[in-house]
Amino acid sequence: DKKIEVKSERDVWQKTGNIAIEYECYGKPSGINATESDYWFHNLCIGDETFATIVFDTTSLKRIINNLDKKRSVSGGDNNAARMYLLNLQKLFSSDVIKAFKETKDAA
């Protein structure tokens, strides 16, 4: 059986073009750094409705994040205790990110 992790991004993504991927909370690994899921589902919501869902193989998403030339880290959540990577959606699917992804697979 395959496991999935489901995250929802509400409204702000429309203005910023970014999604947030949590990696730490209260100084401990969380989100992408703690998940045991095989797949990461990221819902893009408008209000209470799901506009679209992006599905990543979790290992691939980690590889993409690790190979990004620029990634912004921000605090958020309750008490600003969570640390998250802000990933720009256009950048995420750009040719240079896809090329780097292919190159890291070839190098493995």
In which residue ranges do the predicted regions lie?
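Hydrophobic side chains in beta-strands
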Residues: 6, 42-43
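Conserved catalytic cores of phosphodiester-cleaving nucleases, focusing on short active-site segments
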Residues: 1-14
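Generic structural hydrophobic/aromatic packing signal, biased to beta-strands
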Residues: 4, 21, 55-56
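Short acidic, glycine-rich loop/turn motifs
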Residues: 1, 44-46
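Intrinsically disordered, low-complexity, compositionally biased regions/tails
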Residues: 21, 35, 80-81
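Active-site-adjacent loop/helix micro-motif of nuclease/hydrolase catalytic cores
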Residues: 11-25, 30-32
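Non-catalytic C-terminal interaction segments of nucleic acid-processing enzymes
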Residues: 27, 47-108
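Short, positively charged
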Residues: 28-42
